[in-house]
Amino acid sequence: MMNRVVLVGRLTKDPDLRYTPAGAAVATFTLAVNRTFTNQQGEREADFIQCVVWRKPAENAANFLKKGSMAGVDGRIQTRNYEDSDGKRVFVTEVVAESVQFLEPRNHAEGATSNNYQNEANYSNNNKTSSYRADTSQKSDSFANEGKPIDINPDDLPF
């Protein structure tokens, strides 16, 4: 059996950060996720999904996400219930996030009403490689050796 959820959407309000009596951080937020189809009026509708994240990722979400921020959530669906102050049984379905990705630059959420954005950061916990634009001038590369072969003794290599 599998219980896996991957969502991309925008926060409807700033994350709510709290701490348990044991000191564990927990943040809750609602993610507005557009549906892939349009309604009869040709408009896209959204689902508003409650998300919970724990410990250090909760603190990061509270510090770096705010209303309108685009975020990716990877986690699982959880259902729970409790008795409210009136004695009624309340059922809750939420996503417990195992990871939260910040999908736009920190200062970009102010203009979040526009869906036209350039994703400048690509984060993945499973990808150990990163790419960046390097200065390709020969002056900055001390190992360029002006195109000549490098004489290295195989005994000097650590592998």
From Swiss-Prot:
Compositional bias per record (Polar residues), positions renumbered to this chain: 128-143
GO cellular component, one term: nucleoid
Subunit structure, as described in the record: Homotetramer.
Organism listed in the record: Listeria innocua serovar 6a (strain ATCC BAA-680 / CLIP 11262)
Transmembrane segments: none
One Pfam family, short name: SSB
Keyword flag S-adenosyl-L-methionine: no
GO biological process: DNA replication
Gene Ontology molecular-function annotations: single-stranded DNA binding
Name this polypeptide is given: Single-stranded DNA-binding protein 2
CDD domains the UniProt entry points to: SSB_OBF (cd04496)
Annotated SSB domain residues: 2-104
Ranges annotated as biased composition (Low complexity): 114-127
Annotated segments matching region Disordered: 106-159
InterPro entries per record: NA-bd_OB-fold, Primosome_PriB/ssb, ssDNA-bd
Gene3D superfamilies: Nucleic acid-binding proteins
Keywords: DNA-binding
HAMAP family: SSB
